[in-house]
């Protein structure tokens, strides 16, 4: 949000602008708050890219991510502090967006998954998380290095996020 345009300011001179508070000045106090935030703004996804260097012919990467406007970058930094992992990057396609993401498998396995096991997501996001956990279990036992494992991962992946079919 870049505020009111000059034209709007000219036509509505009596409008008082309310300053937006800076989000993220405090740490995350309650794990349920973080879970609720992820329910609304986060996502779990799996990338499987063709790569001949792998015995299965695919490289599998798991990512937990939250995207926000750049003004909320300080808030995303608090997620790194709270979870003890992740990184912040500017979105390559939109300069006003920053992404918090965790893609290192050990951090997903040891920090992200246990956090959401102890503080459950709700609704559709929970279903995506459960599929994400299934993929993690396949990767953990090196199933992603086999054609059968890749097929299972691709099947799970094809039903996650916006590709999920609702009954």
How would you name each of these model-derived features?
Residues 1-167:
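Sequence-level preference for short, compositionally simple segments enriched
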């Amino acid at each position: 949000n870049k505020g009111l345009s000059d034209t709007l300011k000219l036509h509505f001179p009596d409008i008082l602008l309310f300053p937006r508070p800076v989000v993220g000045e405090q740490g995350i106090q309650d794990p349920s708050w973080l879970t609720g935030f992820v329910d609304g703004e986060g996502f779990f996804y799996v990338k499987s890219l063709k790569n001949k260097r792998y015995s299965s012919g695919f490289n599998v990467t798991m990512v937990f991510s939250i995207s926000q406007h750049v003004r909320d970058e300080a808030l995303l930094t608090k997620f790194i502090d709270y979870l003890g992992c992740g990184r912040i990057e500017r979105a390559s396609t939109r300069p006003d967006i920053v992404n918090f993401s965790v893609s290192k498998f050990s951090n997903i396995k040891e920090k992200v998954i246990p956090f959401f096991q102890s503080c459950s997501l709700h609704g559709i996001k929970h279903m995506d998380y459960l599929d994400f956990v299934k993929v993690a279990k396949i990767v953990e036992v090196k199933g992603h290095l086999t054609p059968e494992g890749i097929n299972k991962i691709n099947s799970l992946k094809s039903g996650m996020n916006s590709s999920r079919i609702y009954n």
